[in-house]
Amino acid sequence: MTTAQHQHYTVEVGDTNFTIHSRYINLRPIGSGAQGIVCAAYDTITQQNVAIKKLSRPFQNVTHAKRAYREFKLMKLVNHKNIIGLLNAFTPQRNLEEFQDVYLVMELMDANLCQVIQMDLDHDRMSYLLYQMLCGIKHLHSAGIIHRDLKPSNIVVKADCTLKILDFGLARTAGTTFMMTPYVVTRYYRAPEVILGMGYTENVDIWSVGCIMGEMIRGGVLFPGTDHIDQWNKIIEQLGTPSPSFMQRLQPTVRNYVENRPRYTGYSFDRLFPDGLFPNDNNQNSRRKASDARNLLSKMLVIDPEQRISVDEALKHEYINVWYDAEEVDAPAPEPYDHSVDEREHTVEQWKELIYEEVMDYEAHNTNNRTR
């Protein structure tokens, strides 16, 4: 590396110091979460606006360190227009002993889906957002990554309605048990099979898309449970108690609870999502699109995953297929994700060394690409 590439400067962002490359200027905070603080900045080399995420105390414990490693590996792996791209990664520390900070540089978007949900979306915008969501999910699935935790706060959009998925969901080892309380993170969008601690397949993510679509139409969360039990109750009150064949697939203790709940017949999708909630242009085309949207919801929001629509089927549904582009839907699959990362056990120091090697490798790769 040249001396210029070693130059860093420090900016105070709230109560956090950002020590970043001198190529990035005009920092301003745009968000913070459990995994880090994000600032918008301007990249003077590429001459584009970017988002810089400082991972929050990545070596505080084994869980944080493992999560940081997984996120970094996945961001390097995937490459799709509907998944946030990694533009750069760096650390201001120059050796393993001092290493403590990881910065990820990503594309800058305008808003997350929470803000978009508050707007009155017409059918074209809504179906286009859903189409892009499904394309991104299909790409993750092609790498063997099943998300399980899609939610509006982790989906970002630009003013031109382009959409990107911002994270990679739950690690395969992140099981959830039915009686877990209280809620630490938002679980409103998690599928019944995740809430109930069952096995799951790729269409677990379709449930989340259905919840997000329903929220776009209603303007409010569909199943705002305070814990897993309340979540389950909210689902069956609206959609009805599932069939005995579904109950048979539950673990005995969970089945015992679920079978002893009052039985609900649920409501029709015409009642759950009446015409008045949809864009109304008072024409035949608008009514047909509302009917198509309801039909898609009725196939996504199915408690039994064996009866739920697949990602491929959803992409071909009448409400979505107007946007269908084979190059976007069937983009080249990334290398399969090595799930042994999720199973691996290391000390914090070992994870730290692995992450340091990844960051150094990434910095070297970027430098070589720039100097060719």
From Swiss-Prot:
Q: Which residues form a coiled coil?
A: none
- Induction text: In neuronal cells by wounding of the integument (at protein level). Activated by increased levels of reactive oxygen species (ROS).
Secretion signal span: none
Q: What does this protein do?
A: Mitogen-activated protein kinase and key component of the c-Jun N-terminal kinase (JNK) pathway which phosphorylate and activate transcription factors involved in a wide range of biological processes including response to various stresses, cellular proliferation, differentiation and migration, and regulation of cell shape. Responds to activation by environmental stress by phosphorylating a number of transcription factors, primarily components of AP-1 such as Jra and also the transcriptional repressor aop, and thus regulates transcriptional activity.
Consult the record and explain the modifications the protein receives after translation: Dually phosphorylated on Thr-181 and Tyr-183, which activates the enzyme.
Q: Please give the residue positions where the record annotates the modification Phosphothreonine.
A: 181
Inactivation phenotype? RNAi-mediated knockdown results in reduced levels of DIP2.
Cell location: Nucleus; Cytoplasm
Assembly: Interacts with MKP-4 (via tyrosine-protein phosphatase domain); the interaction dephosphorylates bsk.
Under the cellular component aspect of Gene Ontology, which terms does the record hold? Answer: axon; cytoplasm; cytosol; dendrite; nucleoplasm; nucleus
- Organism name: Drosophila melanogaster
Question: Which molecular-function annotation in GO is an example for this chain?
Answer: JUN kinase activity
Activity regulation, free text: Activated by threonine and tyrosine phosphorylation by the dual specificity kinase, hep. Inhibited by dual specificity phosphatase, puckered.
Where does the protein principally reside? nucleus
At the top of the EC hierarchy, this enzyme's class is transferase
Kindly state which reaction or reactions the protein catalyses: L-seryl-[protein] + ATP = O-phospho-L-seryl-[protein] + ADP + H(+); L-threonyl-[protein] + ATP = O-phospho-L-threonyl-[protein] + ADP + H(+)
Domain-level remarks: The TXY motif contains the threonine and tyrosine residues whose phosphorylation activates the MAP kinases.
High-level lineage = Eukaryota, Metazoa, Ecdysozoa, Arthropoda, Hexapoda
What processes does the entry annotate via GO biological process terms? antibacterial humoral response; axon extension; axon guidance; cellular response to arsenic-containing substance; cellular response to cadmium ion; cellular response to oxidative stress; cellular response to reactive oxygen species; chorion micropyle formation
For this entry, the protein name equals Stress-activated protein kinase JNK
Record keywords = ATP-binding, Cytoplasm, Developmental protein, Kinase, Nucleotide-binding, Nucleus, Phosphoprotein, Serine/threonine-protein kinase, Transferase
Q: Which InterPro entries match?
A: Kinase-like_dom_sf, MAP_kinase, MAP_kinase_CS, MAPK_JNK, Prot_kinase_dom, Ser/Thr_kinase_AS
